Amino acid sequence: MTKVHYSRAPENSTKSCKARGSDLRVHFKNTHEAAMALRGMPLRRAQAFLNHVKEHKEIVPFRRFHGGIGRAAQTKQWNTTQGRWPVKSADFLLDLLKNAESNAEYKGLDVDHLVIEHINVQRAAKLRRRTYRAHGRINPYMSSPCHIEVILAEKEDVVSKPTDDAAPKVKKESKRKQRRQLARGEF
């Protein structure tokens, strides 16, 4: 077996942990879309999201591989129209996040402040089977497994925005309006 390379290095290796699955027997396209929905989520929210996907309470938006995907009302929260509930992909991603969480505990990181910094799904080598057709023909029956990698990073609490009373907003005017005022001599 060759050395495992991640497609990206963590920003701070002391405050992050990694997990990886290779040659997983789960559809690449479904897993890719589910992983893209998880990108940037806190770990606890991502786990809850995947559990909700398994129960059909939340949906995975299909943005890239959306050919032939039906429309669903739940996708409105993602500002798109097409989505599905890929249960097997959710199971595999939950297992991978659980593995990354245990790696974080072993490393001594605060599990409640972990955020998915990087998640990537890549195509693995296809597995070939055969299906028998009419008139003695044989067609390929291929599977599309994938490699999944995830990097979790520990993030501090986000600083809240200042209220509107603290700093008055500066009104920006368009360039066209400024030119018009300059031509009139109002500027």
Curated annotation (Swiss-Prot):
Residues 159-171 have a biased composition (Basic and acidic residues). Keywords: Ribonucleoprotein, Ribosomal protein. CDD domains: Ribosomal_L22. Residues 172-187 have a biased composition (Basic residues). Residues 159-187 are annotated as: Disordered. Disulfide bonds: none annotated. InterPro entries: Ribosomal_uL22, Ribosomal_uL22_CS, Ribosomal_uL22_euk/arc, Ribosomal_uL22_sf. GO terms for cellular component: cytosolic large ribosomal subunit. Pfam families: Ribosomal_L22 (PF00237). One of its GO terms (molecular function) is structural constituent of ribosome. One of its GO terms (biological process) is cytoplasmic translation. Gene3D superfamilies: Ribosomal protein L22/L17. Belongs to the universal ribosomal protein uL22 family. PANTHER family: 60S RIBOSOMAL PROTEIN L17 (PTHR11593:SF10). This is Large ribosomal subunit protein uL22.
